UniProtKB/Swiss-Prot annotation:
Enzyme class: hydrolase
Keywords for this protein: Antibiotic biosynthesis, Hydrolase
Record bears the keyword Membrane: no
Active-site residue numbers: 134, 209, 233
Superkingdom of origin: Eukaryota
Gene3D superfamilies with a match to the protein in the record: Amidase signature (AS) domain
Gene: kk1C
EC number: 3.5.1.4
Name of the protein: Putative amidase kk1C
Keyword Ion transport: no
Similarity comment: family membership: Belongs to the amidase family.
Matching PANTHER family: AMIDASE (EUROFUNG) (PTHR46072:SF2), AMIDASE-RELATED-RELATED (PTHR46072)
């Protein structure tokens, strides 16, 4: 029997990827963790494969790297070589990489070191910093399959604008990371490369659709990754792996020439943003990009420089806090002199319904077309999200307009609710930010069809939103209380997925911080404040 086209494509792509891992960076069979070993976050330190210097370099933040390279203390070559090696190991343990650019990266690092030695200065604020990119971002000469077998062996002829601008600022491209087929799943799985695993528990997902980036960054195989977010695709992975991240409002980060699904769907815009281990790295990314004036290349980019004055926060802040969204069910901030008030969020069900109608306005035709091209199947989790594509009907123009009008009315209603908090904050201002869960549960088991998450509000209303780590699952404290009762059918489904803390051992817990539109500077500053107050240690 002839093998289906998609299986042949997948086999060839995987062989191509593995051939680019140097033999000296391959894990010896005697050292490779057995499948039942779920926690591999500490493998680099315990394996004997890395020198103390390599461990020191890869554990640094992006801000540390750029600072030390700019003074000549570190070289771009040694940093790049170390992180490429760690990414190679991450791939073997976590299956998080799609495209490998190690040779090109090291060659670029040599060029940057030569420039620094000759000129005595850096080429830009990101000089020598290796940055990993979600598979969506086009890098000339490499595929951007976004999980579809039908997109394989079609290398990009030019870089995405964001890639060009970051390279211009001194960044080094060395790897692209795994995503789910369709880009519309909360787990990074596709038929080409397979499933990405969580380094803290390989039986758990890193989320999606930027799950490959999350695996790389949390494993210290990337200093800073670039993900995207249309309904939680950056925030969910950050929450599942203990990272900081930022979903900016549309227009702050260039999205030009990025491979994507749902092309032409502009009612809810996908945005690119940073994923990292420190909030200072969000600032480094955003300010460095703004300094390149992306609006001169990308007509969708707003002519808005990084506004340092907006990072200066009032002495006392007030945060709204929502335990859920009314559909699926702060002590240290108060101790630090800030106020925290309840924010009754009841829009969840309406937001989710509007989003789903927008994403399936074509009746699922695009997803079906791109899988039919090679005969590959859609995963059960995608079928779950689509509500089984065969049952979805394309929206009429009238229905689409009506749905977009609902979005406009909801935006006004939410703004009024935000403004109405002014009388309760004690600061003579409305709340400065809204803290709420990113998901109704910590990192889930592989193959889970998600009943619900909390990512849609920010995406639908285009609100600047950050993510920050809080804690990890505690096997003793996090059992389901006997007195718990669900708010809705979806709420019960969410708790059924959680079931018991043992299913989420070593999983991390993150929250999201929602600001207003185009408040990237303020939200980034508040993430730093929250980090300093919480002093998270997991």
């Amino acid at each position: 029997m002839t093998e289906p086209t998609w299986k042949t494509v997948a086999s060839e792509k995987q062989q191509q990827r593995e051939s680019k891992i140097p033999s000296e960076w391959q894990i010896p069979k005697s050292s490779h963790p057995a499948p039942e070993v779920t926690f591999v976050q500490d493998f680099p330190a315990k394996s004997g494969m890395f020198t103390n210097r390599e461990l020191q370099l890869t554990a640094a933040t992006a801000s540390d790297v750029t600072a030390k390279i700019s003074t000549g203390e570190w070289t771009a070559v040694e940093v790049t070589t170390a992180v490429c090696k760690r990414a190679a190991v991450a791939q073997q343990l976590l299956n998080c990489v799609t495209e490998i650019c190690f040779d090109q990266a090291i060659a670029r690092a040599k060029e940057l070191d030569a420039y620094f030695e000759k000129e005595g200065k850096t080429v830009g604020p990101l000089h020598g910093l290796p940055i990993s990119f979600k598979d969506q971002f086009n890098v000339k000469g490499f595929d951007s399959t976004i999980g579809y077998c039908s997109y394989a062996s079609k290398p990009a002829t030019a870089d995405s604008t964001l890639v060009k601008l970051l390279v211009k600022a001194g960044a080094i491209i060395y790897v692209k990371s795994n995503v789910p087929i369709t880009l519309m799943m909360g787990e990074s799985f596709n038929n080409i490369f397979g499933r990405t695993l969580n380094p803290r528990n390989r039986e758990l997902t890193t989320g999606g659709s930027s799950g490959g980036e999350a695996a790389l960054v949390t494993f210290c195989a990337s200093f800073l990754g670039v993900g995207t977010d249309i309904g939680g695709s950056l925030r969910i992975p950050c929450s599942f792996t203990g990272l900081y991240g930022l979903r900016p409002s549309h227009g702050r980060v260039s999205y030009q020439h990025v491979q994507n699904t749902l092309l032409g769907q502009e009612a809810v815009r996908s945005c690119a943003g940073p994923m990292c281990r420190a909030p200072e790295d969000i600032r480094l990314f955003m300010s460095s990009l703004a300094a390149q004036q992306p609006w001169l290349w990308d007509p969708q980019s707003l002519p808005l420089p990084w506004r340092a004055e907006e990072e200066v926060l009032p002495k006392k802040l007030c945060f709204g806090f929502a335990l859920g969204d009314g559909h699926v069910g702060p002590k240290k901030l108060k101790q630090a002199g800030h106020a925290v008030i309840n924010f009754n969020l009841t829009e969840g069900k309406e937001v989710n319904e509007i989003m789903n109608k927008m994403f399936t306005a074509d009746g699922g035709a695009e997803f079906q077309r791109d899988t039919d091209a090679t005969g590959e199947p859609l995963p059960p989790t995608v079928e779950y999200w689509l509500g089984h594509s065969s049952q979805i009907k394309a929206s009429t123009v009238s229905e689409t307009w009506k749905n977009q009008h609902k979005k406009a009315l909801l935006a006004q209603k939410f703004l009024e609710k935000w403004q109405a908090t002014k009388g309760r904050t004690g600061t003579s201002r409305p709340i400065d930010g809204l803290i709420m869960p990113s998901t109704p549960f910590p990192a889930s088991r592989h193959g889970s069809g998600w009943p619900w998450h909390f990512g849609d509000l920010s995406a639908l209303l285009d609100l600047t939103t950050g993510v920050f780590p809080v804690t990890r699952v505690n096997l003793e404290k996090d059992a389901v209380p006997p007195s718990w009762t669900p708010m809705s059918v979806k709420d019960k489904e969410a708790m059924d997925y959680y079931e018991k803390p043992e299913n989420h051992e070593n999983a991390l817990v993150g929250l999201q911080l929602i600001g207003r539109r185009l408040e990237e500077e303020k939200v980034t500053a508040m993430l730093t404040l929250i980090r300093n107050v919480l002093e998270v240690d997991y």
